[in-house]
Amino acid sequence: MKTEIQEIVTRLDQQSNKGEGGESMKWLFRPLLQMLAGGESVTIEDMATTTGKPVEEVKKVLQSLPSVEIDEQGRVVGLGLTLIPTPHHFTVDGKQLYAWCALDTLIFPALIGRSVNIESPCHSTGEPIRLNVEPDHIVSVEPSTAVVSIVTPDDMSSIRTAFCNEVHFFSSPNAAEDWLDQHPGGKVLSVEDAFELGRLMGTRYEESRPANGSCCHI
C-alpha cells in the first residue's frame, strides 16, 4: 500500500505543479490556510505581509485561481479551507469552518498545526462520519470502517472541479461500490492510508511558513 500511496502522491504532485496556482501555491497556500483557520476572511494585504510577497504579486496569483472564494470586499474566504458551508465540517479551536473535500480535512491539521474535529456524511448513505485528527496522527474515526475516495485527474486547472468534488468519505468499502463502478480510475483508501497520503502531499507546502511570524504562528 505504501508504494501505491507514493504513486498517487507523485501523480497528484505532477498534475498540481501544472494546474491551478502551480508553483505559487507552495508559498501562498499554507499561510493562507493558517489565516483562514482563525475563522475570518483574509485580505490581500495580510497575505502579502505574512508571505513577504508584494501585494501585486499576491493579487495576480489569486486572480489566476478559478477555485478561490472571494467575498464582496475582495477578501479571501476559501481555498480548500473555507468559511462557506460544505458537507465537510472542520472545527478548529471551537470555530466552525468547512473543507472542500474529505482529503482536505486530513491534510489541513498538519498545515495549520491544530487539533481538528471533523464531521462529514457518507457520500452514499448519509451516515455521519466523525474524526478527531491531530497534526501528526488520527485520534479517532467513527465508524472505524470509513474510507476515502481518491481520483487522479489529468487536468487540475480547476482543482475543485477536477479533484475535490470527487473526494468523499464513505462509511465502508461496501458503501463506496457504486462510486467505484462510476469512476473506473478511482480508488478508495482507509482513513489511515488517506491521512498518510495527505501527509505526503502536504510536504510540498512546508517551505511556505509565515515570513514574519506575526500571524497564525505554529
Swiss-Prot record:
<dbReference type="GO" id="GO:0046689">
    <property type="term" value="P:response to mercury ion"/>
</dbReference>
<dbReference type="Pfam" id="PF03243">
    <property type="entry name" value="MerB"/>
</dbReference>
<keyword id="KW-0475">Mercuric resistance</keyword>
<dbReference type="GO" id="GO:0018836">
    <property type="term" value="F:alkylmercury lyase activity"/>
</dbReference>
<dbReference type="Pfam" id="PF12324">
    <property type="entry name" value="HTH_15"/>
</dbReference>
<comment type="similarity">
    <text>Belongs to the MerB family.</text>
</comment>
<dbReference type="InterPro" id="IPR024259">
    <property type="entry name" value="MerB_HTH_dom"/>
</dbReference>
<keyword id="KW-0456">Lyase</keyword>
<dbReference type="InterPro" id="IPR004927">
    <property type="entry name" value="MerB"/>
</dbReference>
<keyword id="KW-0476">Mercury</keyword>
<comment type="function">
    <text>Cleaves the carbon-mercury bond of organomercurials such as phenylmercuric acetate. One product is Hg(2+), which is subsequently detoxified by the mercuric reductase.</text>
</comment>
<protein>
    <recommendedName>
        <fullName>Alkylmercury lyase</fullName>
        <ecNumber>4.99.1.2</ecNumber>
    </recommendedName>
</protein>
<dbReference type="InterPro" id="IPR053717">
    <property type="entry name" value="MerB_lyase_sf"/>
</dbReference>
<dbReference type="InterPro" id="IPR036390">
    <property type="entry name" value="WH_DNA-bd_sf"/>
</dbReference>
